[in-house]
């Protein structure tokens, strides 16, 4: 396993991945996907949320982040960036500023955003939305009312919101729906 050093911290970078072949593990050029937690803020209150107990590291130092992205690109090991939270769309201006920074460094960078769909109509105001690799929207029930109950919030995307967002995109496949199936939601 290769190791890289960033800001006096050594990090391992995998040089293998799992496959469905009999040997199951295949060696490859070391690559990584950078995960950026934009915020801890979220207007949902999911019972199963893993971010409830997560530590708030404050705001992102964009200069340091730009350094890290450039460094990983120079090493030729960065294959994409995922932006998560909390809920990234509680801070759309910061999200779009972050995306602008990423695309200024590499206009072809694969960038994915994970969201519960809160404020998703704001994406139409971002001129580079069609450059995104994907927008992963969490849905836990097909019925909007039941979905809001599971999220314990009325601030999440409705089916209509998602359809409107998809309608504004050139590539309709950018939208991915992520679902967590729970026993309490299956029969409702």
What are these regions (language model features)?
Residues 1-36:
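N-terminal [4Fe-4S]-dependent radical SAM core
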Residues 23-63:
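Canonical Radical SAM [4Fe-4S] cluster-binding loop centered on the CxxxCxxC motif
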Residues 32-36, 79-83, 111-113, 135-137, ...:
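Hydrophobic faces of well-ordered beta-strands that scaffold small-molecule active sites
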Residues 46-49, 76-78, 143:
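Short, basic/glycine-rich phosphate-binding loops at helix/coil junctions
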Residues 55-67, 88-134, 139-146, 153-161, ...:
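Canonical radical SAM enzyme core domain
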Residues 71-87:
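Short Fe-S-cluster ligation motifs
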Residues 71-75, 126-131, 165-171:
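Acidic (Asp/Glu)-rich catalytic clusters
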